[in-house]
A protein has these predicted regions:
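Sec-dependent N-terminal signal peptides
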Residues: 5-14
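Extracellular carbohydrate-recognition regions
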Residues: 20-41
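Extracellular beta-strand elements of beta-rich domains used
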Residues: 27, 205-209
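Short tryptophan-centered beta-strand motifs in secreted/extracellular beta-sheet-rich domains
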Residues: 27, 94-96, 154-166, 170-172
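Secretory/extracellular carbohydrate-interaction modules
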Residues: 59-136
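Short, aromatic/His-centered strand-loop micro-motif at the edge of beta-sheets
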Residues: 138-160
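Short strand-turn-strand beta-turns centered on an Asx-Gly dipeptide
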Residues: 173-177
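Flexible glycan-contacting loops in extracellular carbohydrate-active proteins
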Residues: 182-205
Length: 211
């Protein structure tokens, strides 16, 4: 009887392992077919080379800003996205190692997710003082949540970001520091990527999808 119980336990462990999914993108190639998008009138680029993804957004130039009546860098964003190998209806984790540039009110970085297309997505974005959860639907800004950030130590340029979903709560971590949680925001799409705002440079070493 004891041997039979051990066999059942071992079978359950194997079944659990078989159901788990772990995919790591190391940017040795464009295996997940990453795509880029910039706000109209603003430039940027994303390049996969030498095992990293480098995303550069140019922000707004002085001439365009003057014509639009905005501050330099205002209302500019650049994204790079793929379709993650995940079922977003189930719990998952996404972990990524990045190097970020200078942050300011008009220089932000973050994670893009629940991405359907350029006008329908969620994002966690932050600077040195504040983190925001933003939502776009049909090219319109439809909601946000903001809160201040208190870094436990001096913020590093090299960081680990982690996005977790348990089915009802979305949690965003920077270097194990939980900087924002939101609840009851249903996920429909597996699109995932990176969000830069203003004049910014983001280098991505790798990203791991766990389910």
């Amino acid at each position: 009887m004891k041997a039979k119980r051990l066999f059942v336990v071992a079978a359950l462990i194997c079944a659990t392992s078989a159901n788990a999914q772990n995919v790591k993108e190391t940017f040795d190639s464009n295996s997940l077919d990453w795509n880029e998008c910039a706000t109209e009138g603003h430039g940027g680029k994303s390049i996969i080379d030498k095992g990293v993804l480098t995303i550069t957004s140019e922000g707004a130039n002085k001439f365009w800003s003057a014509m639009a009546g905005t501050q330099i860098g205002e209302n500019t964003c650049f994204t790079c996205s793929c379709y993650a190998p995940l079922n977003v209806q189930r719990p998952f984790k996404i972990s990524t190692n990045v190097t970020i540039g200078k942050l300011d009110n008009d220089r932000l970085v973050g994670l893009l997710f629940n991405y359907k297309d350029d006008g329908n997505f969620y994002a966690f974005i932050f600077n040195d003082e504040e983190v925001n959860f933003i939502r776009f639907k049909d090219m319109k800004f439809v909601g946000s949540k903001s809160q201040s950030v208190k870094w436990s130590k001096t913020r590093k340029a090299q960081q680990n970001w982690r996005l977790e979903s348990d089915g009802s709560t979305l949690s965003f971590f920077v270097d194990e520091l939980p900087i924002m949680k939101v609840r009851y925001m249903p996920l429909e799409y597996a699109g995932f990527g990176y969000y830069t705002f203003g004049k910014q440079k983001l280098i991505v070493d790798d990203v791991e999808f766990v389910q």
